[in-house]
């Protein structure tokens, strides 16, 4: 029952946390920030491909 409520709540919200009103202009940036570590992971593969996986 509780799990269903949490799942429905998360699916209804576009973001998991709401920023205070003063930080509303930064909302698109906050949505992108979790992707940055994945970009570093991809960069490691591109780097290794450029040196032929030595």
UniProtKB/Swiss-Prot annotation:
Q: Which GO terms describe its cellular component?
A: chloroplast thylakoid membrane; photosystem II reaction center
- Can you tell me where the transmembrane regions are? 29-49
Alphabetical keyword list: Chloroplast, Membrane, Photosynthesis, Photosystem II, Plastid, Reaction center, Thylakoid, Transmembrane, Transmembrane helix
User: Where do the coiled-coil regions begin and end?
Assistant: none
* Pro-peptide positions on chain: 1-17
Gene Ontology biological process terms, A to Z: photosynthesis
Intracellular or extracellular location(s): Plastid, Chloroplast thylakoid membrane
Membrane topology field: Single-pass membrane protein
- Cited Pfam families: PsbK
Signal peptide positions on this chain: none
As for family, the record states:
Belongs to the PsbK family.
Q: What does this protein do?
A: One of the components of the core complex of photosystem II (PSII). PSII is a light-driven water:plastoquinone oxidoreductase that uses light energy to abstract electrons from H(2)O, generating O(2) and a proton gradient subsequently used for ATP formation. It consists of a core antenna complex that captures photons, and an electron transfer chain that converts photonic excitation into a charge separation.
- Partners and quaternary state? PSII is composed of 1 copy each of membrane proteins PsbA, PsbB, PsbC, PsbD, PsbE, PsbF, PsbH, PsbI, PsbJ, PsbK, PsbL, PsbM, PsbT, PsbY, PsbZ, Psb30/Ycf12, at least 3 peripheral proteins of the oxygen-evolving complex and a large number of cofactors. It forms dimeric complexes.
HAMAP family named among the record's database cross-references: PSII_PsbK
Q: What is this protein called?
A: Photosystem II reaction center protein K
Natural source organism: Euglena mutabilis
């Amino acid at each position: 029952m509780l799990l269903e409520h949490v799942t429905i709540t998360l699916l209804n919200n576009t973001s998991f946390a709401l920023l205070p009103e003063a930080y509303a202009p930064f909302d698109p940036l906050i949505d992108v920030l979790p992707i940055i570590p994945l970009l570093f992971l991809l960069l490691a593969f591109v780097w290794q491909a450029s040196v032929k996986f030595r």
